[in-house]
Design a protein with these regions (language model features):
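Flexible "cap/lid" subdomain of the alpha/beta-hydrolase fold that forms the substrate-access gate
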Residues: 12-14, 56, 63-100, 107-259
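Ser/Thr-centric signal marking residues that sit
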Residues: 8, 28, 126
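Pocket-edge structural micro-motifs
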Residues: 8, 18-20, 238
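Conserved HGGG/HGGXW glycine-rich cap/lid loop of the alpha/beta-hydrolase fold
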Residues: 17-65
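Generic detector of ordered secondary-structure context
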Residues: 8, 24, 34, 202-206
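N-terminal cap/lid segment of alpha/beta-hydrolase-fold proteins
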Residues: 1-13
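Short active-site segment of divalent metal-dependent hydrolases/proteases
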Residues: 36, 105-106
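The conserved beta1-alpha1 loop
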Residues: 30-34, 102, 238-239
Length: 259
């Protein structure tokens, strides 16, 4: 593995990790982590995939060794997608890449495949436990206004699973939630999620600043969603033991993704 530091047009420095031999003409796979992780969460699988792909992962702004903007507005999804575009253009300037996103990584990748900035640059997208916020907002609206009782129960179930999002929108509550519930993320959530999570040196900082992702985006997308369609081939991975993202969020994905 090698690490490089990439400066973007908005004066953000991104820590980018690359696995695989640059001299091998292998397809490039870009992996985007979620909250409250950093790119090291991909290390084990990146090492395994590096035999067939040139694997790239980076710390998103506010996480790991990348820049940490102070303003909440700096964490809007459009800036995250600009960061992703900078990484893609740096590591694969001429060839389309394959994209994988988990949690908040998937959320921003949905934006990337449904907006013009990266048109033609993404060969495929694998989404793990993260919907488009716009798609999720439309799903809720349609379910509440036109859906069956079963649809409404699914929405209520998802809202119950998303309890922490409301807490993150209140400064004092979000700090308390993080310190009490999430500061020991691996120890607390490995048993719940049936995962073997590791501690990272920047874990507390990643969580503290990553909360701004929620504050910068959720309310706007919930009340002002935009129709976002894509022709990029999509592979959807739905972990069966995810305690925060329910499968129902993807019930009507076919109306947005044609492949």
């Amino acid at each position: 593995m090698k690490t490089l530091h990439l400066s973007t047009a908005t004066d953000i420095t991104l820590a980018v990790r690359i696995w695989g031999d640059d001299n091998i003409l292998a397809p490039t796979l870009v992996m985007v982590h979620g909250f409250p992780d950093n790119s090291l969460v991909w290390q084990t699988i990146a090492e395994q995939l590096s035999t067939i792909f040139r694997v790239v992962a980076y710390d998103v702004r506010g996480a790991g060794d990348s820049s940490i903007p102070k303003a909440t507005s700096a964490y809007k999804i459009r800036y995250l997608v600009e960061d992703l575009a900078a990484v893609i253009n740096a590591v694969s300037p001429t060839e389309p890449i394959h994209l994988i996103g988990h949690d908040w990584g998937a959320i921003q990748c949905w934006e990337a495949v449904t907006t013009p900035l990266l048109a033609g640059r993404i060969a495929s997208f694998t989404s793990i436990s993260g919907p488009s916020l716009d798609h999720a907002a439309y799903w809720m609206r349609q379910g509440l206004t036109q859906g069956s009782m079963d649809d409404k129960r699914k929405i209520l179930n998802q809202l119950i699973h998303s309890w922490y999002i409301a807490a993150f929108h209140f400064p004092l509550a979000s700090q308390l939630t993080w310190r009490v519930a999430f500061n020991k993320w691996p120890q607390m959530f490995s048993p719940i999620q049936a995962l073997n999570l590791e501690d990272f040196p920047t874990q507390a900082s990643d969580g503290h600043h990553g909360v701004k992702l929620y504050r910068a985006n959720f309310i706007e997308r919930l009340f002002k969603p935009q129709p976002r369609h894509t022709t990029v081939p999509i592979q959807l991975v739905i972990p069966t033991q995810d305690k925060f993202v329910t499968p129902a969020l993807f019930d009507y994905l076919g109306q947005w993704a044609s492949r």
